[in-house]
Amino acid sequence: MSWFDTTLSRLKGLFSRPVTRSTTGLDVPLDAHGRPQDVVTETVSTSGPLKPGHLRQVRRDARLLPKGVRRYTPGRKKWMEAAEARRLFSATLRTRNRNLRDLLPDEAQLARYGLPVWRTEEDVAAALGVSVGVLRHYSIHRPRERVRHYVTFAVPKRSGGVRLLHAPKRRLKALQRRMLALLVSKLPVSPQAHGFVPGRSIKTGAAPHVGRRVVLKLDLKDFFPSVTFARVRGLLIALGYGYPVAATLAVLMTESERQPVELEGILFHVPVGPRVCVQGAPTSPALCNAVLLRLDRRLAGLARRYGYTYTRYADDLTFSGDDVTALERVRALAARYVQEEGFEVNREKTRVQRRGGAQRVTGVTVNTTLGLSREERPRLRAMLHQEARSEDVEAHRAHLDGLLAYVKMLNPEQAERLARRRKPRGT
């Protein structure tokens, strides 16, 4: 604004009349003659030429305005107390930048998958048959805790090294078994998953690969530790659970590796890694199957594209087909899909089995039919021949009964031929 405009606006302010407005139309008390008791005049100072879009500054004393009837307005209902919000959205495991609708479950989505509707922690505690305090004792991740909920021990691997197992203690194991029956066993699983699924076994996982020219076997590295707390929580939210309930359930089914630390004479167990599905918890196998649903669908689509068949038993991925020229393409794309889904292929355990050699899937020979391999059948016949000469006849007989039952499950005709070589009892 130039000096001329400024001077002109000041001169107009000196000679202009104040703008007044009567407020008699307001809800004010009237006297006996029907006239308002108080009349408030608002003075508007026009500070310059008004243009469209300009604002006027109105100066008035609010104490002179008539007071209307006060109506009671109830306060907004709190979703949760401050302490509860800090516990659920602490920075250790849960982000605080959440939308309000994330607190609520999608009941239509839960009904679509046949899952129980749990809106709050109270619903989860009631379903598990414990108090809210007991549930929170197991469902809060602590940076240090004096009592461990898992017992950790090492089991040697056949390939060398050790495998760490984390067995939950009695009360936590009981809670996880109830969760397995109420929730985890109902989670959606792909048709290609054959491990830890009721009605499926190593036989159903190996049968689709019988008589194929080439069999490709891949192995997922660190299968259980790759399924983290965030994956489990995200799966439950996608299935329809609210954020607090999903976070509570995810903590119940995961655990982090902990290191004992002594501080001022008190022994604490401090986490040294993220919370993951542990091998030893009743919920881990079925939960990992549900987390791998999208990977199974992508790998099954890849197999169909090249005329292959795909199945998975736990962390063992198997492809089979008759087009040998597409083998390398399938292997490369499968490894890429696995990496995109947050897993890793164990290169040392990748195997390609052709028709001229032994083809085994989940420990079952699939060259021409399901059953024992050429090397295993003579070994079992020798064990049947030596049955009567064993020092502990009953123990040896029970072991052979189990082997024959296993063969009968895979191939009844092969088991019947082997059983004919067995001597009757008492001879």
From Swiss-Prot:
Residues 136-366 form the Reverse transcriptase domain. It comes from the Bacteria. Its EC number is 2.7.7.49. One of its GO terms (molecular function) is RNA binding. Keywords: Antiviral defense, Magnesium, Metal-binding, Nucleotidyltransferase, RNA-directed DNA polymerase, Transferase, Transposable element. The keyword Ion transport does not apply. Mg(2+) binds at D219, D315, D316. InterPro entries: DNA/RNA_pol_sf (IPR043502), GrpII_Intron_Splice-Mob/Def (IPR051083), Reverse_transcriptase_msDNA (IPR000123), RT_dom (IPR000477). The keyword Magnesium applies. PROSITE patterns: RT_POL. It catalyses: DNA(n) + a 2'-deoxyribonucleoside 5'-triphosphate = DNA(n+1) + diphosphate. Pfam families: RVT_1. One of its GO terms (biological process) is defense response to virus. Reverse transcriptase (RT) responsible for synthesis of msDNA-Mx65 (a branched molecule with RNA linked by a 2',5'-phosphodiester bond to ssDNA). The retron transcript serves as primer (from a conserved internal G residue) and template for the reaction, and codes for the RT. The retron is involved in antiviral defense. Belongs to the bacterial reverse transcriptase family. M.xanthus contains two independent and unlinked retrons: Mx65 and Mx162. This is Retron Mx65 reverse transcriptase. The lineage of its organism: Bacteria, Pseudomonadati, Myxococcota, Myxococcia, Myxococcales.
